[in-house]
């Protein structure tokens, strides 16, 4: 009987360790940088497309960016919003340091040449665990 209880306790300890390990695996330390954007009146679709292509090149231009997403499936604007945001850009940074170092980097400056002239307003969220 003691052997069975010991086995059950040991199994419980392994199960608890596995669940803690699984939780850690689902909580990465990368930083997700989410930008919702409204473009200036008169911005042409070609300008937006060029800006989005520039975003897609950022992981090659800046090692701290691991992934980007540019295809917003759904964009919600608050009821009565004066400026309607139409696009969402998401960049995944390897770490908080990578995000901080991106500020004023050559890669950011290059992308800003495409982005800032057409941006009306944007809201940014930086998220990590």
Where are the regions that the model predicts?
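An amphipathic, aromatic/His-enriched active-site/gating alpha helix that lines ligand/cofactor pockets
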Residues: 26, 45, 57-65, 83, ...
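N-terminal targeting signals for Sec/Tat export/insertion, comprising classic cleavable signal peptides
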Residues: 31-58
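Short, well-ordered beta-strand segments in beta-rich or mixed alpha/beta enzyme
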Residues: 30-39, 71, 76-103
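Positively charged n-region of N-terminal signal peptides that target proteins for export
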Residues: 1-4
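A general secondary-structure junction signal
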Residues: 69-74, 126-128
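Boundary at the C-terminal end of the N-terminal hydrophobic targeting segment
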Residues: 20-24
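Non-catalytic interaction surface on structured domains
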Residues: 51-52, 68, 92
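Bacterial N-terminal signal peptides
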Residues: 7-17
């Amino acid at each position: 009987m003691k052997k069975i209880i010991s086995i059950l306790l040991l199994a419980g300890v392994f199960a608890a360790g596995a669940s803690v390990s699984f939780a850690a695996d689902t909580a990465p330390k990368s930083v997700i940088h989410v930008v919702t954007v409204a473009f200036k009146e008169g911005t042409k679709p070609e300008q937006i497309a060029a800006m989005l292509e520039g975003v897609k090149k950022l992981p090659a231009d800046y090692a701290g960016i691991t992934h980007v997403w540019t295809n917003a499936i759904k964009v919600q604007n608050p009821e009565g919003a004066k400026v309607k945001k139409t696009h969402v850009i998401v960049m995944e940074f390897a770490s908080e340091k990578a995000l901080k170092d991106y500020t004023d980097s050559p890669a950011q400056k290059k992308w800003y040449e495409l982005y800032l002239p057409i941006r009306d307003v944007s809201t940014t969220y930086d998220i990590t665990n």
